[in-house]
From Swiss-Prot:
Lineage start: Bacteria, Bacillati, Bacillota, Bacilli, Lactobacillales
Position of the signal peptide: none
Record's protein name: 1,4-alpha-glucan branching enzyme GlgB
CDD domains in alphabetical order: AmyAc_Glg_BE, E_set_GBE_prok_N
Gene designation per UniProt: glgB
Highest taxon of the lineage: Bacteria
Amino acid sequence: MVKQTTEMNDASYLFNTGAGFNSQDYLGCHLAASGRAVFRVWAPHAKAVGVVGDFNDWQPSALKLLGATGIWQGQVPNVHAGQLYKFQITTPTGQVQLKIDPFAQQFERKPGDAAVVVEPMTMRWHDSLWLARRKKSRAANRPINIYEVHLGSWRRHLDGSYYTYAELAAELIPYVKQRGYTHIELMPVMEHLLDASWGYQQLGYFAPTSRFGKRDSFLSFVDQCHQANIGVFVDWVPGHFIRNYDALYQYDGTPTFEYADPERANNRRWGAWNFDLGKTQVQSFLISSAEYWLDQCHLDGLRVDAVSNMLYCDYDEGREGQVNQYGDNRNLEGIAFLQKLNTTVLTHHPDILMIAEESSAYPQVTGSVANGGLGFNYKWNMGWMHDTLDFFMMDPLYRHDHFNLLTFAFVYMFDERFILPFSHDEVVHGKKSLMHKMSGDRYNQFANLRTMLTYMAAFPGKQLNFMGSEWGQFLEWRDWSALEWVDLKDDLNHRMQQFTTQLNAVYRHNRPLWEQDHDPAGIIYTHTDDPDSSTMGFIRQAKRKYSFVVAAFNFVPVERQDYRIGVPYRGRYELLLNTEAQAFGGTWTKLETTFTAVDKPYRGQPASFTVTLPAMGALLIRPVKVIGGVKHAR
């Protein structure tokens, strides 16, 4: 047990008691005056610890154990930024092994895994206006339209080499801004060795990957995103870590970061080791990592990966007997850790977002910790995603028999605060791209995709789409090569990209599509019970009485003449979007752009108007001047 021999705010005490939320400022390598550096590492069961690196010809400089803290410390001369180093650990059995610095802020390029000595962070930020606006606005009441990106395959040079952070800033940021997205979500940028892991088996929890450049170049990328009014989320993996023996596994020769029980430690599904989330030092390590990315790197939020794996003792492992003291399979340490993580982070940064990728039916993922919830701001709506894809993959001839795939989500849409995700996981490993999933010939695949993305934009919840879907890339995603940008030479792909740009603009500039995403008052059900026609309609309502958007969908390739739509008020309405417009790759050369609602009740609404509902298409319509209303009430 660690004894408190100094003040309560002593860094070693805080780290050991699970309250060290900036432990990277204490542990790791820290340059001091006169070319010296202080090295500290937690290795509680080691017999001896040294540091080796370029500064001592890789001959160990001994560190001393600080009492009962489990932390080893030493000051080493002739240390300069850019030099490589590792810790040399002598295990309880006398084995000598080289280990990474868990708190390193930069690593050498793979295949090496030595840490790099870095200068203290001196980044001059230029995003004060962005941060000020972020503090003033509530996420629930603003548009969130996320472009998910794998930096290693968004673009590559002709020789196959990666774009640097600087090159990505020069091309990715203007592209995302032009397309109209509000945020970028980066698949993990934390240092990792295996490209095929996509970053989800992490080596460095405080280090942007060196594949694309140095730490400060990554910070500049984030800064430039904010200057362009684009938020940045990053995927973060606090549940499991890379198997490599020279990383965190058996760090001091005993289970240090992972569970002591080998069954609980071994994550067979992903070939990784599970963190012991009940260990206070591990809590300090992981929460410090989250705080580092949010505070020091100015990220706008973290998408926490594989939350289900942390909620259950035996998640997707097929093992029996993994139970808690209450006899069920809830991972009580994992649940408590997530509550502590979100409470800590959101207390320090109330304007950022913590997003859960959680695929089970665990309750109250976005509920408050005080009421027993996990405390996340958002949860990915995996059920909506799977059901929606299953519906659009189906031959339209059979959709009327499976309309529940769409309507079931209406039952639980407000149980959590949801993000609707068409992510990287759905376009890889033989699952096909979004475009390739769509039913029908090439023309109808584009029509289906336009309709599905419009359905997503109109449905309550924030939204996320993976790169390449915006133009309907046919090939599924491959992490080892760039997107198929050549597709844009094809007229249909080019028009699909223009459609996505317009849809994003309609979404962003119309409050009803996002202002009340998590409030039942944000949707009026007008036509959700007609499976025989395979059509659907509903109204998205903003807080202002006369600010709403009418959404109508036709999920079969049969045009509906004189299709009646019920609305709350008589008066004049205008078209926002017709997915079958020729400009988007459809067949409509002349669009109905205005509609007049009369006092003819329909489907529970006092007024109505008729439209021609395009085959395999969707319409978004808003009021212009209604009785008692105002023009363009957005």
